């Protein structure tokens, strides 16, 4: 079964054709990230205007010489203006082609980027699994009992891990490059100590708002913002965030006797995070770097394994779509 997938939740306009949930036949991404650089972050109005310009050319390129049996589209969460472009376009295609349409939760779909890795094959022995979705807007833990059944276990009570990376990058003068800039700069020249939030509480929740405050205080109390200080602060920020993510995930593994770990989302591209997970004694799966950030490929994979076709009239953009399942 071939699925045309459309993703427009933020600043990327993406379309892909996915076969049987595991094979990428095409994947096209039009990014407006460079345009947002001068603003120091994503401007919703600018993002939606770019989505409008890019959506049809992107879909046309993705479907060139390819047939598809159904349409999948991100309905949320995300920016309302951006979501509307993808949703209304998908509904129009469904109406014209008379093909089924499948609404997709963007956050949950990040997990299914793992199923698109050519090295991965779906085996029952890998379940139950713990899935960590970690991005600029979300930090969530799920229990997967098979390739389609998910149960929400916990998430951030304030800011996401990616938000902490992004704000730190801006503070250190790296613009909006976020976690990648922190990763490239991190080097322990001297000791900087930051708190590890909610590390030892009884829940599977996360909190990174206090960490952002602690980072700002550390920056303000050191007047000498030398290269060594910047690299040391970047190192500690990365250590704190990855320590907390791994600790909470492993706590979930122990609680639910999980057999494997899946991660997804933009922060899952962080090499230090991957290194720490690889040092655990449980099978660990992460997507190729190219599938960690927003794209339509994992939207199509999610739709194949977990999606349910609905009447196109009933689909609406849902910017505040909940992730608890």
Where are the regions a protein language model picked out?
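Conserved phosphate-binding catalytic cores of ATP/NTP-utilizing and phosphoryl-transfer enzymes
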Residues: 1, 104-130, 302
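N-terminal beta-alpha supersecondary unit
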Residues: 2-67, 73, 77, 83, ...
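A short helix-loop
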Residues: 5-9, 16, 26-27, 125-126, ...
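Phosphate/ATP-binding catalytic cores across multiple sugar-kinase/actin-like superfamilies
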Residues: 57-62, 236-258
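Glycine-rich phosphate-binding loop and adjoining helix at the ATP-binding site
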Residues: 72-116
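Glycine-rich beta-strand-to-loop/alpha-helix junction loops that act as flexible
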Residues: 73-77, 93, 135, 262-270
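Glycine-rich phosphate-binding loops at beta-strand->alpha-helix junctions
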Residues: 82-83, 258-277
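Conserved phosphate-binding/catalytic loops in two-lobed NTP-binding clefts
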Residues: 103-104, 277-299
